[in-house]
């Protein structure tokens, strides 16, 4: 009823701060006990809530975003992005900044169109990157798919990594399913258990080194 709805609204506080360095917004829940938090997202509860932020800012600015149990959507950014997302989804058009940090756990069907340079830490997730200049990936129990990348370093355990086109790859994995389409410059893999499939190593590749233990 209306009284219960108003009570829940009164227990949510959105804090905005502005300074010369930027603008920040935080959502505070005055009651964070387990039963109250569950009622926000449980359809069997009396009240369901959804809190959305829409931010309009010049694309040259940098962003620092943390969100749990929800999605993060970015169109195009020239500045750097620091993003943390758990139990949600990331959908990004373009990240042109020189230093981007993406941390996410328990996310599915996340997508990035283009990223210039990024460090990715992911657990129990699935994501796709269409094009990247440089990627450093650390992922466990995660399905990673990269369509095109210039330079890739990865350290992944369990899950899978699928790379369609790459200039340079340095990779380490345990219990990882590794699929690589075409390599144009160099390939250095260290894999234990799991599997590895490479479709084509182009003429002129300067280095190919593959070390495996119990990998097919």
Language-model features, listed with the residues they occupy:
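Acidic (Asp/Glu) and glycine-rich low-complexity loops/linkers
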Residues: 1-67, 73-85, 89-122, 126-138, ...
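A beta-strand-loop signature enriched in Asp, Gly, Thr, and Trp
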Residues: 169, 176-216
């Amino acid at each position: 009823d209306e009284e219960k709805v108003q009570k829940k609204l009164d227990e949510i506080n959105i804090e905005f701060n502005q300074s010369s360095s930027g603008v920040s917004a935080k959502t505070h829940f005055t009651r964070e006990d387990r039963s109250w938090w569950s009622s926000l997202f449980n359809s069997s509860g009396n009240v369901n809530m959804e809190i959305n932020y829409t931010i309009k800012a010049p694309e040259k600015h940098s962003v620092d975003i943390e969100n749990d149990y929800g999605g993060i959507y970015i169109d195009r950014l020239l500045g750097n992005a620091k993003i943390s997302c758990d139990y949600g989804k990331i959908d990004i058009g373009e990240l042109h900044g020189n230093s981007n940090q993406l941390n996410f756990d328990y996310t599915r069907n996340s997508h990035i169109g283009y990223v210039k340079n990024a460090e990715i830490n992911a657990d129990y997730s699935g994501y796709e990157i269409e094009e990247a200049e440089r990627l450093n990936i650390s992922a466990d129990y995660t399905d990673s798919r990269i369509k095109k990348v210039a330079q890739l370093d990865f350290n992944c355990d369990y899950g899978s990594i699928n790379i369609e086109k790459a200039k340079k790859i340095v990779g380490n994995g345990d219990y990882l399913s590794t699929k690589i389409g075409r390599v144009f410059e160099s390939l250095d893999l260290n894999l234990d258990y799991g599997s590895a499939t490479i479709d084509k190593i182009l003429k002129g590749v300067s280095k190919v080194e593959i070390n495996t233990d119990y990998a097919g």
